[in-house]
Amino acid sequence: MFRVGFLIISSSSSLSPLLLVSVVRVNTTNCHKCLLSGTYIFAVLLVCVVFHSGAQEKNYTIREEIPENVLIGNLLKDLNLSLIPNKSLTTTMQFKLVYKTGDVPLIRIEEDTGEIFTTGARIDREKLCAGIPRDEHCFYEVEVAILPDEIFRLVKIRFLIEDINDNAPLFPATVINISIPENSAINSKYTLPAAVDPDVGINGVQNYELIKSQNIFGLDVIETPEGDKMPQLIVQKELDREEKDTYVMKVKVEDGGFPQRSSTAILQVSVTDTNDNHPVFKETEIEVSIPENAPVGTSVTQLHATDADIGENAKIHFSFSNLVSNIARRLFHLNATTGLITIKEPLDREETPNHKLLVLASDGGLMPARAMVLVNVTDVNDNVPSIDIRYIVNPVNDTVVLSENIPLNTKIALITVTDKDADHNGRVTCFTDHEIPFRLRPVFSNQFLLENAAYLDYESTKEYAIKLLAADAGKPPLNQSAMLFIKVKDENDNAPVFTQSFVTVSIPENNSPGIQLMKVSATDADSGPNAEINYLLGPDAPPEFSLDRRTGMLTVVKKLDREKEDKYLFTILAKDNGVPPLTSNVTVFVSIIDQNDNSPVFTHNEYKFYVPENLPRHGTVGLITVTDPDYGDNSAVTLSILDENDDFTIDSQTGVIRPNISFDREKQESYTFYVKAEDGGRVSRSSSAKVTINVVDVNDNKPVFIVPPYNYSYELVLPSTNPGTVVFQVIAVDNDTGMNAEVRYSIVGGNTRDLFAIDQETGNITLMEKCDVTDLGLHRVLVKANDLGQPDSLFSVVIVNLFVNESVTNATLINELVRKSIEAPVTPNTEIADVSSPTSDYVKILVAAVAGTITVVVVIFITAVVRCRQAPHLKAAQKNMQNSEWATPNPENRQMIMMKKKKKKKKHSPKNLLLNVVTIEETKADDVDSDGNRVTLDLPIDLEEQTMGKYNWVTTPTTFKPDSPDLARHYKSASPQPAFQIQPETPLNLKHHIIQELPLDNTFVACDSISNCSSSSSDPYSVSDCGYPVTTFEVPVSVHTRPSQRRVTFHLPEGSQESSSDGGLGDHDAGSLTSTSHGLPLGYPQEEYFDRATPSNRTEGDGNSDPESTFIPGLKKEITVQPTVEEASDNCTQECLIYGHSDACWMPASLDHSSSSQAQASALCHSPPLSQASTQHHSPPVTQTIVLCHSPPVTQTIALCHSPPPIQVSALHHSPPLVQGTALHHSPPSAQASALCYSPPLAQAAAISHSSSLPQVIALHRSQAQSSVSLQQGWVQGANGLCSVDQGVQGSATSQFYTMSERLHPSDDSIKVIPLTTFAPRQQARPSRGDSPIMETHPL
C-alpha cells in the first residue's frame, strides 16, 4: 500500500523560465530507504524554500509501463509562460532538462516548445517505489530550467505514477501442507498461507477459492488490521483418520484488476491424532526500537508462549510467518526453541526504517499461536552528505565553459545535497569557497543554484576551480566536498585605449600641403584578433586632414586659412578586429596660428549719421565699426580722422565720433570727412571709409497760445446760446516745422459737467448742452495744446474762463472771480466755476424763502404769546432808547476812509453809531486755581446806522421793508447743526432760575462770512451767530439788545450764593416766582422758567429799571449789558479818528477801577498757537468772544458773533458741567442782510488792554503767527505783553479793536468790511500781512 503525499506548485513573481528536471535517483535495491528519507526532508523543509530565484513546481500523472514518446504535458502552456512580457532576449526561450551525468531519464522535453514526452526506459512502479509503504503514492521527480537567463526559472516536475495490474497474486509455495486433528469439530477454521501481489489497491489480492474440496472442507477469507486478506480452511464434516488420513485439493487466488489475474497452489491436508490444547503467547503485539548501528547478534526481543498439554504435545516451536518479508528474514534471526529474535545482518535505517515480524508458536498441532513484533530502527549520523551536480550549462570534459561577458546571475548548475540520516542528522548546508565571483542561491529543499555574482574577466582570471562543501548538523557533523571547474572564454570586451583622451596641436596658416602633424597610438587588453587595432578619422574630421590606418600618422593635406577656420576639433577612432568590433576615440584640437594677411574692414563703405541740431558739444554723433579677421596684434585696429579735421574727434579704440562744434542746421546741413583704420601687425595694413553727418531739426518749441493771450481773460456766454454753437476759439502756434508744428487741442481740466467740447484741430470750443439755471456763473476750462513732435510731444495749457450769464453787469466782480479761480489749484476734472455765482444765490434765496415762511409762522405765534404777557409801554420805551455811537477806523484803512470822507459827508448825515457793551462773567467753582475769581468780557460793537437805509429794497427780492420791526423773522437758518441748547449739569436752587425779559422788538441777527445775516426767531430772545471760513475765527454769542443806559445781567450763582448785581427788584424768593410757557432766550429748552412782576405791574427788564440780572438755568456765566459812555464822544478829537482814542475819550473821571466788585478786567484772549505761557488756562469752550452789533434805531438789530476753534462753525461752548451748547449757524440770503459782522480770513484783530479808568472793557489779542485764531480763556494783552485775567490788566496803554462797515458808492449795494488792526496810541499801525488790509466785497 502507498501513503498519500502532497504537492506544492509555486509561482514566482519574476517568472524566470528555467526548469531543471532533476531525475530522482531511484534504484531497485535501496529505493525504499531513499524515498522515505527524501519524503521526510521534503515535508519538513519545503515550507522554508526560498522562491525568489524563480522556482516553481508542477505535477503530472502518468501510468506505469507507458510506452515511448507519449506526450505528458506542455510547460509553455501549463505554466502560462506565454504571458511573460515581451522582453529583448539574447536567445529564444529554451527548456532544458537538468539531470545527473550517467542517469537515464524516464522523460524528455522539447527545448523550444516545452513539450514533455516519455523515453524508451521502462516505467515500473513496483521497481521505482519498491521500498515505500503500500498506502503511499509513488512519485518521480525531475527539474527543468527555462532559459535564457533574462527569464530564468527553475521548475520541479513531479510525476505521480499510477499502478496497473501488471502482476498476478502468488502463494509462497506451489504446495501447501497442513495437518488437522481427527477430532476437529465441524466449522473449525485453520489458517492457510496468504498470497502476495506487488500491485496495490484493486490490483492486489481480492479473493481466494478452494477447488475440488469434495464438500469436506470449505474456504473463508478474513482481513487483518494491516489490510491483508488471509485465507482460512473450514472443516465441514467429521474426520476419521482410520477411514482417510490425507486430502489433496487446489487453492486459487485472484486480484481485482483488469484484466483479472490469478494463480493456484496445491493444498495437502493430513489428518492426525487428537491434540487438545493450543500454544498461547503472553504478548501478542510487541514494539521495540533499536539503533541502526547495533552490531550483529544483538538481541531484539524475547517471545514467550505456553501449552497446557504434556509430553510431546506441550513442546512449542517458534517460526516466522510466510508474510514476513524477505528483507526482514535476512536481517533478523528467530530461535525456534527459545523464541529469541536477534540481528542477523547490520541494519540500515535509511534503507528500511521499520520491520514487521509475524511470529508463529506451534505445539505440533494445526492451530499455532500468532504474535506481531514491530521493530523500529532508530537513526544515527552514519551517513555523510552527498553532493549531486546537475549542469545547466553543458560541460565539456566535466568543465563548464563560460563567456567572460555573461550577465550577472547567470545560472550555471543545480546543486543537490542529500543526507540519508533523519532529523538534524539529515539537515545539510552547502557553501563554496570565498573570494570567487560565484554564489549558491537556494531554490528548493537542499537544492541550490550556482550563479555568477560578479562579472567575469578573462584578462584577470581565465579558470576557476570551485570547491563545493556540504555538511550535516549531526554531532559530530559529517561533511562532503565536490569540485566544479569553470573555464572563462575570452570575448572582445575591451576597446582600444588611447594614451591621451585629448590632444592639442598648433600649425601656422598658409602651410604647405602634405606636412605631417602628429601620430596617435592605442592599446587593446584583449588577445588575438581582438587586440588588432586599426585607426580611422571620425565622421566629424575635416577634409584638410588624413590618417594612416596602421601607423596612426595624421597629415595635413590642404593649405589652411585661419580667417576661414581658426581651429579644428575632430576625433580619431581606434577599432579592433573582434566580433563585434570595439572602438574608442581621441579628440584632436588643431589650433591655427594667425598671420597678418588681412586689412581692417569697415562694416559700411560710407557712414551717414543724422544728429539733432541741439546736440551739445562733445556729444555722441555715432559709432564707427571696423573689423579685422586677423588675431591678436594683427587685429588691433586704431581709428583716426584724415585731413586733420578739427570739427570732429573719433575715439581711436571705440570709434565714437564727437563734435567739437555746435550744430546749426541753418548754417550748415552736413559734414563729410574720411576715417582711417590701421591694424597693429608687424607689417601693418590699413583702410578708410567716408563719413557724412547730417544735421536735422528737433522739436524744441512748444505751442504758444495767442488766443487767449493769458489766463485772466474771460468770454461771455449767453444762457440762450444753442447747443453746437462755437462760443470761443483758442489759437496756438508752434515755431517748429513739419509734424513738430502740428497742434492738437483738448480739454484736460474743469468742464466737469461736459458743458463744453473742443475741436482738436481748429480749437473751436462748442457749447454741448442748453444752459440751465445751475450752469450760470463762471466756468474755468483748462485747454491743452500739444504738437505732434517725435519722440516726445510738447504742450502748453491755458485757462479759458467762460462766464455764463445774460450780461456782464459788474466787470469788477467777474475779474475778481477770475483772479480767485487762478489762485485756486487746477487739477483735471475740477470744476472751475465760482461757487458764489449769482445762480447759487438765487437758489439760496428760493430755499430761504420757503424755509423762512415756515419759520415766520412759528415765530409770529410764539411772539404773540410772549407779547401778550408783557406791558404795552415797553415797546415805546424801547423805541426811544437810541444812542449815538462813534467809531475809530482801522489805521490800515484810514486812507481809504479819508478818500471817502468828503463824499459821504455830502450825501449822508453823520453816522449815528450805537455802542453797547456785553459783559460775560463766569465763576468757575470747579477750578481749584480760580478760587471764585470772575472773568468779565466787555465788548463794544458799532454798526453804521445808515447801512439799512442805503439798501436797495426795490431791486432786491425780499419779503420785508427796511423799517420792519422784526427783521430776523424773515431769515432762514442755514446751519447744519441743531438748535442751540443749554442743559444744566448740576441741580440748582429754583429761586435763582430767573430770566430778565427784554423788549419785544429786539432782534438778534447772525452774520456769516459773506455778509449773510440770519436770525433764529423773532422772539425777544434769539440766538445769532457769525460764520467764517475755516481759516478765520467765529464768535457766536447771545445778545439782548437794550436801550441806552440799561444793564441786563444773566447770573447763575453757585448753590445758595446770591448775585452781586443789583436786580433792582429786591430779594428773590421762590414764592414770588411764576412759571412761564414761552420759549427761553438763546434757544434754551423750556425746563423751568420764572416770571416775576414788579409793583408797577411791569415785567422785569424794562427800560426804566437799573441794570438788572437775569438767571438762566444751567448757565454759570453772568452776562451784563453795561451803559454806553456817550460822554466819551465829547472828548474825542479828529486825531482819534486816525490814531485811535485815548484814555480821555473812554474813561470819565467819576469811574474808578476798584470802586465796584464787578469792575474786574474782562478780556477776549486769542492765544497764539505757539504760546507757551504757564498761567491759568481755561479750556477753549469756556472762553467766549462776544461781539455785539447794533443796527440803526429803526430795527435795532443786534448781531452776535462767536469764534470757536477754527474748524468749527459758530457755536457757543460751555465747559461741562457748566453749560452744554450746540452750534447754530445762520446763512440767510445776502439780499436780506441788515447788519454785518464780518471777519475775513486775514482780518487783523486788535488787542485792547483794560484801562484803569474804565470798569469793563474788552481786550482782544490776535495771533501774529496764524491767520486762523484759536481762543484761550484766561489771557489778555497788556502794555507789557500777555498777562493772566486773574491778575487783571494793570497797563495804562490802550489798544483798540473796531470793525467798520461802509459803502463806497451810493449806487453800490455791497457792504465793505474794513478789518481792524492792533496799534498803540500815537503810533502808526503795522499791517499784519501786506501793505494794506485785504478787502472782501459781497456780490450784492
Curated annotation (Swiss-Prot):
Residues 58-171, 172-281, 282-387, 394-498, 499-602, 603-705, 709-827 form the Cadherin domain. It is found in: Cell membrane. Its main location: membrane. Expressed strongly in fetal brain and brain (cortex, amygdala, thalamus, substantia nigra, hippocampus, caudate nucleus and corpus callosum). Expressed at low level in testis. Expressed in apoptosis-resistant cells. One of its GO terms (molecular function) is calcium ion binding. The keyword Acyltransferase does not apply. The chain crosses the membrane at residues 845-865. InterPro entries: Cadherin-like_dom, Cadherin-like_sf, Cadherin_CS, Cadherin_N, Protocadherin, Protocadherin/Cadherin-CA. Residues 29-844 are extracellular. Keywords: Calcium, Cell adhesion, Cell membrane, Chromosomal rearrangement, Glycoprotein, Membrane, Repeat, Signal, Transmembrane, Transmembrane helix. The keyword Glycoprotein applies. GO terms for biological process: cell adhesion; homophilic cell adhesion via plasma membrane adhesion molecules; positive regulation of Wnt signaling pathway; spermatogenesis. SMART domains: CA. Glycans are attached at N59, N80, N86, N376, N585, N805. Residues 1052-1112, 1321-1340 are annotated as: Disordered. GO terms for cellular component: plasma membrane; sperm head; sperm midpiece. It is linked to A chromosomal aberration involving PCDH11Y is a cause of multiple congenital abnormalities, including severe bilateral vesicoureteral reflux (VUR) with ureterovesical junction defects. Translocation t(Y;3)(p11;p12) with ROBO2. This is Protocadherin-11 Y-linked. It comes from Homo sapiens (Human).
